[in-house]
């Protein structure tokens, strides 16, 4: 396994000045119940999921950060943004809305697929 660099940001000050999204998260007990009853189950863990979400062009300026190498802006969602989990959950819920509770559940970057038959 190759070592990889992971960018880490201290976003505490930015998060203190950010409006907090209060999108509700799925009921974990309901997810566990549906999956436990299924004969077949799969779990997909999306790698670096937040970093695959683009930030709206008009909001990129809000992501400015400085390093010893210069000042930069992020064009993708970072793990430390306070609204990253709720934004990502909203997106996954929108994508899978027709299947949620039927044979799919989504909790943040995990997709659970379940059924009684193949």
Could you describe each region identified by the protein language model?
Residues 1-118:
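Retroelement reverse transcriptase polymerase core
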């Amino acid at each position: 396994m190759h070592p990889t660099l992971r960018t880490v940001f201290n976003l505490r000050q930015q998060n203190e000045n950010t409006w907090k999204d209060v999108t509700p998260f799925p009921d974990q007990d309901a997810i566990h119940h549906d999956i436990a009853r299924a004969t077949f189950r799969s779990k997909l863990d999306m790698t670096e999921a937040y970093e695959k979400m683009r930030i709206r062009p008009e909001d990129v300026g809000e992501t400015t950060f400085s390093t010893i190498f210069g000042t930069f802006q992020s064009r993708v969602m970072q793990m430390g943004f306070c609204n990253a989990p709720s934004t990502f959950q909203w997106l996954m819920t929108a994508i899978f809305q027709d299947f949620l509770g039927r044979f799919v559940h989504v909790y943040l970057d995990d997709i659970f697929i379940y059924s009684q038959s193949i």
